[in-house]
Amino acid sequence: MAIHLYKTSTPSTRNGAVDSQVKSNPRNHLIYGQHRCGKGRNARGIITAGHRGGGHKRLYRQIDFRRNEKNIYGRIVTIEYDPNRNASICLIHYGDGEKKYILHPRGAIIGDTIVSGTEVPIKMGNALPLTDMPLGTAIHNIEITLGKGGQLARAAGAVAKLIAKEGKSATLKLPSGEVRLISKNCSATVGQVGNVGVNQKNLGRAGSKCWLGKRPIVRGVVMNPVDHPHGGGEGRAPIGRKKPATPWGFPALGRRSRKRKKYSDNLILRRRTK
């Protein structure tokens, strides 16, 4: 990803650094409107996901995570910005006339050809079952359930590694550091997701953050006692308790949120690294 640095003409552009991406020109048959409401609230209006709200209107781009066009070659026509994810997307024109969006693989350029199916070349952007891949292959957009489409390693710069194959299962090392088993018949895409330098962007001003639908983050220690357990006191007072707490009084650090009995516990060989 190419980083574009602004000249220092105004305070808001003094430290701005954004990616010089191809402008978005979505196809009408691949987009539809979505009703965004709630602003991080649940059905009762209580905040369940903080610091969300506002933002520019978005059109959802329908992404092909299944890669159902088997053994039909396609050509990358455009590389576009997608407001619904931090990874870029690219438009594919297939030989049978179909046009679909997929996640942009790192290093892919306009004019490259891709294909999905069994016994296809181990090439960046191609999708094939794990059983046909050699060990050590870097992959993304990995299926968990056969035929459901890719669900793992879809964020910008995400990449997993195929480290073993035994019996009916394949062992993968995920971007989080977790090592788990997945059926060898599940499909994945070769390569790494593009837009690797997304974390190097500097928006330069608060207004650009608001356009993304992200609201300001306020520390609890500067609030009033009625708003947060850390609030109150004279001047710069400490939080007044042994351990940090959430706005609702629960422990803020180290609380486990995963269910104790889950079907995938037997498939996880090593937990993710924190």
UniProtKB/Swiss-Prot annotation:
Keyword field contains Ribonucleoprotein: yes
Gene Ontology biological process terms from the UniProt entry: mitochondrial translation
One Pfam family hit: Ribosomal_L2
GO molecular function: rRNA binding; structural constituent of ribosome; transferase activity
InterPro entries cross-referenced by the UniProt entry: NA-bd_OB-fold, Rib_uL2_dom2, Ribosomal_uL2, Ribosomal_uL2_bac/org-type, Ribosomal_uL2_C, Ribosomal_uL2_CS, Ribosomal_uL2_dom3, Ribosomal_uL2_RNA-bd_dom
Keywords annotated in UniProt: Chloroplast, Plastid, Ribonucleoprotein, Ribosomal protein
Chief location category: plastid
Signal peptide range: none
An annotated GO cellular component: chloroplast
Record's subcellular location: Plastid, Chloroplast
UniProt keyword Cell membrane present: no
Region (Disordered): 1-22, 223-274
Entries under HAMAP family matching the protein: Ribosomal_uL2_B
Oligomer status and interactors: Part of the 50S ribosomal subunit.
Family named by the database record: Belongs to the universal ribosomal protein uL2 family.
Protein name: Large ribosomal subunit protein uL2cz/uL2cy
Species per Swiss-Prot/TrEMBL record: Phaseolus vulgaris
